[in-house]
Amino acid sequence: MSALPIPLLGQSLSALKDWAVAQGQPAYRGQQLHAWIYQKGIRSLEQVTVFPRAWREAVQSYPVGRSRIVQRTEARDGTVKFLLGLADGQLIETVGIPTAKRLTVCVSSQVGCPMACDFCATGKMGYRRNLELHEILDQVLTVQEDFGRRVSHVVFMGMGEPLLNRDTVVQAIRSLNQDIGIGQRHITLSTVGVPRQIAWLAQQDLQVTLAVSLHAPNQDLRQRLIPSASHYPLDTLIQDCRDYMLRTGRRVSFEYTLLSGVNDLPIHARQLAQLLQQASRSGVQLHVNLIPYNPISEADYQRPHPTRVREFVRQLEQHQVRATVRQTRGLDGNAACGQLRGSFLRSLPGDL
């Protein structure tokens, strides 16, 4: 028997057709398999009832590449966090965020994260490895299966730095679009910033939204909060964002987590406005998403008072910088951005 693409999840329509033909089956069997994997979300080839029984039995032992759900936690607002177990025993987290018109999935790109941002729970757990293509796609299918509705938006804002797993993440973006049917303009890639990688991303002919996690308006403070920033001067990062917008025609969003008494003062807002005006001088669009901090047990930072948040917005708007305060979802389910954490592992008895 010819080698089967393993895992099946992540294989393109043409690859699955070619495999079916190599098995002595008509090409449309590969098309059927593609539909059952990406649209029906099967977990085993035994579920593909349109296949001839003999052939289904011959190939049923080959893995689709789906992860198992270890834990599911639902918040009062309907946000659901999934703890997923990978084939090698590693654990990742995925968040499904529903609204009346959208279903957004916050996907992870790595097990843990090497960036070690001082305020981030994922950064505190360290880095294990990059995720593989099927492990990223599986997160979207898991949420789609659980909610019983199509995923409309995907944000790479879960565990990990996507641009440190760039090739696989770009493969995943293309597959989300071509195989699962999610528009590229409904996909957001969030990055803290990795030298030379934003320029690389701009050359990939994608139409995704780039979200850059700034979290500070000056280099000194940013290095305190994000150790890796010492290798990527803020002025260079902003210039790379400007070049990205000019090359792709896509707006860049800037993420800014507000930490009480640390980066949320009026002087910080004015510095941030001045910084971003560098990127907007050529008429390119930019937008700031302000994220009031979600407290975690691993860090001493606090959430700012709402009046402080409103004043920060006012200062930005006075300087013609558009800003939105992001609605925090899933706080009671421990699922909001920055709260992906190892609570499950800590609940297990003994040493792991």
Swiss-Prot record:
This is Probable dual-specificity RNA methyltransferase RlmN. Its EC number is 2.1.1.192. PROSITE patterns: RADICAL_SAM. Binds 1 [4Fe-4S] cluster. The cluster is coordinated with 3 cysteines and an exchangeable S-adenosyl-L-methionine. Keywords: 4Fe-4S, Cytoplasm, Disulfide bond, Iron, Iron-sulfur, Metal-binding, Methyltransferase, rRNA processing, S-adenosyl-L-methionine, Transferase, tRNA processing. It comes from the Bacteria. GO terms for biological process: rRNA base methylation; tRNA methylation. Disulfide bonds join 106-337. One of its GO terms (molecular function) is tRNA (adenine(37)-C2)-methyltransferase activity. The keyword Magnesium does not apply. Specifically methylates position 2 of adenine 2503 in 23S rRNA and position 2 of adenine 37 in tRNAs. Reaction proceeds by a ping-pong mechanism involving intermediate methylation of a conserved cysteine residue. It catalyses: adenosine(2503) in 23S rRNA + 2 reduced [2Fe-2S]-[ferredoxin] + 2 S-adenosyl-L-methionine = 2-methyladenosine(2503) in 23S rRNA + 5'-deoxyadenosine + L-methionine + 2 oxidized [2Fe-2S]-[ferredoxin] + S-adenosyl-L-homocysteine; adenosine(37) in tRNA + 2 reduced [2Fe-2S]-[ferredoxin] + 2 S-adenosyl-L-methionine = 2-methyladenosine(37) in tRNA + 5'-deoxyadenosine + L-methionine + 2 oxidized [2Fe-2S]-[ferredoxin] + S-adenosyl-L-homocysteine. Its cofactor is [4Fe-4S] cluster. InterPro entries: Aldolase_TIM, Methyltransferase_A, RlmN_N, RNA_MTrfase_RlmN, rRNA_lsu_MTrfase_RlmN/Cfr, rSAM. PANTHER family: 23S RRNA METHYLTRANSFERASE (PTHR30544), RADICAL SAM CORE DOMAIN-CONTAINING PROTEIN (PTHR30544:SF5). Gene3D superfamilies: 1.10.150.530, Aldolase class I. [4Fe-4S] cluster binds at residues 113, 117, 120. The active site is at residues 93, 337. Belongs to the radical SAM superfamily. RlmN family. Pfam families: Radical_SAM, RlmN_N. It is found in: Cytoplasm. GO terms for cellular component: cytoplasm. Residues 99-332 form the Radical SAM core domain. The keyword Transit peptide does not apply. S-adenosyl-L-methionine binds at residues 160-161, 190, 213-215, 294.
